[in-house]
Amino acid sequence: MFIKFKISNRPIAPHLLVYTPQLSSLFSIWHRISGVGLAFFFTTFLIFIRIILSSNFACNLLTLISFEISQWIIIYFNLFILLFLFYHLFNGTRHIIWDFGFLLDIKYLSKFSLFLLVSLSLILIFQ
């Protein structure tokens, strides 16, 4: 079998650069990335809360306030987390709908992708 591929001068497995990325595959990859990002954020947040509650609260609160985090950093961080959360929620809903076998036609795929992008844009605008 290996000789057959060697004779035809074809690669055994096609390279990723051969394919053009499809919107549904990009959204699936971004869904996984947003899930990892949310898991990292919530785990870090819970560990941070646990540390604050397990030790001297007033001392830790004064230390936290003394960091003097800029208001813009807090706003962008909240926006980033909100965007990840809603993207993961909307795209997860889409994956659940697909698991039930609905909206698998190409026209529905592109319409739902457009709906996802528009809804995330509206969240960014009205946040």
UniProtKB/Swiss-Prot annotation:
Similarity comment text for this entry: Belongs to the cytochrome b560 family.
Bilayer-spanning residue ranges: 36-53, 60-83, 109-126
Membrane topology: Multi-pass membrane protein
Compartments, record wording: Mitochondrion inner membrane
Residues given in the record as heme binding sites: 88
Cofactor binding annotation: The heme is bound between the two transmembrane subunits.
Native source species: Chondrus crispus
Lineage of the organism: Eukaryota, Rhodophyta, Florideophyceae, Rhodymeniophycidae, Gigartinales
Role description: Membrane-anchoring subunit of succinate dehydrogenase (SDH) that is involved in complex II of the mitochondrial electron transport chain and is responsible for transferring electrons from succinate to ubiquinone (coenzyme Q).
InterPro entries per UniProt: SQR/QFR_C/D, Succ_DH_cyt_bsu_CS, Succ_DH_cytb556, SuccDH_FuR_B_TM-su
Gene name for this UniProt entry: SDH3
Subunit comment: Forms part of complex II containing four subunits: a 70 kDa flavoprotein (FP), a 27 kDa iron-sulfur protein (IP), a cytochrome B and a membrane-anchoring protein.
Cofactor: heme
The protein's name: Succinate dehydrogenase cytochrome b560 subunit
Sample GO molecular function, one term: electron transfer activity
GO biological process, one term: tricarboxylic acid cycle
GO terms for cellular component: mitochondrial inner membrane
Keywords (A to Z) from UniProt: Electron transport, Heme, Iron, Membrane, Metal-binding, Mitochondrion, Mitochondrion inner membrane, Transmembrane, Transmembrane helix, Transport, Tricarboxylic acid cycle
Pathway as given in its UniProt record: Carbohydrate metabolism; tricarboxylic acid cycle
Predominant cellular place of this UniProt entry's protein: mitochondrion
